[in-house]
Regions:
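An exposed acidic His-Trp-rich patch
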Residues: 90-192
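Generic structural hydrophobic/aromatic packing signal, biased to beta-strands
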Residues: 75, 83-85, 158-163, 176, ...
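Amphipathic alpha-helical interface segments
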Residues: 41-44, 49, 85-95, 105
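Histidine (H) residue identity feature
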Residues: 37, 72-74, 97, 120, ...
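N-terminal "first-domain core" detector
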Residues: 1-78, 82-83
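Long, compositionally biased interface segments
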Residues: 184-247
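Short secondary-structure capping micro-motifs at structural edges
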Residues: 70-73, 81-89, 144-149
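Short, well-structured alpha-helical interface segments that form or flank functional binding sites
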Residues: 70, 80, 94-96, 156, ...
Length: 247
């Protein structure tokens, strides 16, 4: 089983790769915060209560803007989407994780990105583009030209994979996927590794990048103890099997 410190090295290797290839425009190093028997894998400027602070207002422009304003992410990709990793180890055993891919709610072009100096300036760019888009939408609606507008606002949901066996109930799977709203908890086979998450993001949302880089396609998967229950297997759920362990 991979340790918290091994995960830190893996995440920082990923961040270095994304920066070197121009796929990320801002980043925060992965670090570990130790507290008693707990080790929390987080980022350098993350809130102290990582697993509580990021709950609420899920899948809203307000939440996204708060995250980019406070740089609450491990990295921001070239299109303004952000990636967060969070793992909690208790007595060297994985007890929680929260991995989130948060797409930018606006279409951000490469020329937009070239107009700013650093990721710190992205909030100003986002506010400007959002204001322009709202003004354009307002004018289009009043002039009955809405259907002709080149809409930059996107109906894109974040994807957040949570693992929290301490909160497991019949309606709260130990491992689950949030999308669209906080109350949607789609059962997942078990805790997901960095490899599962990286492959999920780039394979499904950046297919050209996925096809170009062997590093992403070959990123290893680690499997922890499955947490899916018989009841959850009777519903639609997210599955993945470790075929390498089969005879």
């Amino acid at each position: 089983m991979m340790t918290a410190r091994a995960l830190v090295r893996q995440i920082n290797e990923l961040l270095s790769f994304l920066l070197e290839e121009g796929l990320a425009i801002d980043w925060n190093s992965a670090i570990i915060r130790d507290s008693g028997h707990d080790s929390i894998l987080t980022w350098a400027n993350a809130p102290d209560r990582l697993f509580d602070a990021l709950v609420g207002r899920f899948a809203t422009i307000t939440e996204y803007r708060n995250l980019i304003e406070n740089r609450h992410y491990h990295c921001m990709l070239f299109d303004g989407s952000i990636i967060q990793f969070g793992y909690l180890y208790t007595n060297n055993t994985l007890s929680k994780h929260r991995n989130c891919y948060y797409p930018c709610p606006l279409v951000i072009t490469s020329s937009d990105i070239e107009s700013i100096q650093t990721g710190h300036d992205f909030v100003t760019l986002f506010d400007l583009l959002l204001t322009q888009e709202i003004d354009a939408l307002r004018a289009a609606i009043s002039e009955s030209e809405f259907s002709r507008l080149q809409n930059l606002l996107r109906l894109s949901t974040p994807f957040r994979f949570d693992f929290d066996p301490g909160s497991q109930t019949d309606t709260h799977p130990a491992s689950h996927l949030h999308l669209l709203n906080e109350e949607c908890r789609w059962p997942v086979f078990g805790p997901i590794s960095i490899g599962h998450f990286v492959r999920f993001i780039f394979r499904h949302f950046y297919p050209k990048i996925w096809s170009k880089y062997d590093v992403l396609r070959n990123w290893g998967l680690q499997f922890h103890t499955r947490s899916i229950t018989d009841q959850e297997r009777g519903e639609l759920f997210v599955e993945c099997n470790d075929f390498s362990q089969r005879p």
